[in-house]
Design a protein with these regions (language model features):
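Short pre-catalytic strand/loop immediately N-terminal to key active-site residues, enriched for Gly-Thr
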Residues: 186-196
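Glycine-rich phosphate/adenosyl-contacting loop at the front of the ribokinase-like
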Residues: 1-41
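Charged C-terminal helix
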Residues: 230-273
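Glycine/small-residue-rich loop that forms an oxyanion/phosphate-binding "nest" at active or ligand-binding sites
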Residues: 69-118
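Active-site cofactor/substrate anionic-group-binding motifs, chiefly glycine-
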Residues: 31, 35-89
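Conserved phosphate/ATP/ADP-binding segment of small-molecule kinases
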Residues: 101-182
């Protein structure tokens, strides 16, 4: 089923506007290129509306938040809404500071998001203020496991229904849900957590998939999550004893670049709830 979503990205090569963080911006741009789309990484408030206008989708990531980019995110998000473009929110570290949490709430209040993608602690913070974010990582107390999966799926569906956005909660088990349906995805490898920015790259990848698949936000987001996880598996299989997390990062991008829609279809590991 996900082969079609990936094939559309390669066929349409959509232009995606990313207002992302300075730690991972280069990797995010390369991830968008690897999947077959084109990135623009513009974050000055004086031009974001113009850039959003010439693009077909927007990815907002609050990882290295500052007062200058908050204005840029709000302006770009509102312009994307006016144009009917899909918008992704990656609320990196929501709950870790008042600025991050308040900005995430303001973005949710003023911008209509197509997909909200974060770890379980970040998404819990957005939903209720109850997440226990550990920096930009999910706290152990929040993490999704087989034992609490039913509750996590119900939570994701409820938050999706409340916001009108597809909710993508990523971790050892990924959940991608709208108000009625959820994909529980088991692709990926534990070593992905040793790389800074795999979540940021996934949000950029999700924006590309959304932009190429209008009207299918749930399936597009689930396809992107499966693709990223499968890339982590493929990349890990290439590692030698002398390779570390830097090599692994490059191999993940290579795996997306070389992945075919048929490989994604065959390698996606998910169930529907």
């Amino acid at each position: 089923m996900f082969a079609e979503q990936f094939a559309n990205v390669r066929a349409k090569s959509p232009l995606v506007h990313n207002i992302t963080n300075y730690v991972t911006v280069n990797d995010c741009a390369n991830m968008v290129l690897a999947c077959g789309a084109s990135p623009i990484m513009a974050d000055d408030a004086a031009e974001v509306e113009d850039i959003t206008t010439i693009c077909s989708g927007l990815n907002i990531n609050i990882g290295t938040l500052n007062s200058r980019t908050i204005e840029s995110m709000l302006k770009a998000g509102k312009k994307a809404n006016a144009l009917g473009h899909p918008v992704v929110l990656d609320p990196v570290g929501a709950g870790a500071s008042a600025l991050r949490t308040e900005t995430a709430y303001r973005l949710l209040d003023e911008v209509r998001f197509t997909v909200i993608r974060g770890n379980i602690s970040e998404v819990k913070t957005l939903a209720s203020g109850a997440g226990t974010t550990k920096g930009v990582d999910a706290d152990v107390a929040d993490r999704v496991t087989e034992e609490n999966l039913d509750g996590a799926v119900a939570f994701a569906k409820a938050f999706a229904a409340k916001t009108g956005a597809v909710v993508a909660i990523t971790g050892a088990i990924d959940i991608v849900a709208d108000g009625a349906k959820a994909y529980c995805i088991r692709n990926g490898h534990p070593m992905m957590s040793a790389i800074t920015g795999t979540g940021c790259q996934l949000s950029a990848l999700t924006a590309a998939f959304l932009t190429a698949n209008p009207g299918q936000p749930l399936e597009a987001a689930a396809a992107a999550v499966c693709a990223m996880g499968l890339a982590g598996e493929i990349a890990h299989a290439r590692l030698t004893p002398l390779d570390g997390n830097a090599t692994y990062r490059n191999y993940i991008i290579d795996a997306i670049y070389n992945m075919t829609p048929a490989q994604l279809e065959e390698g996606a590991k998910y169930e529907v709830r």
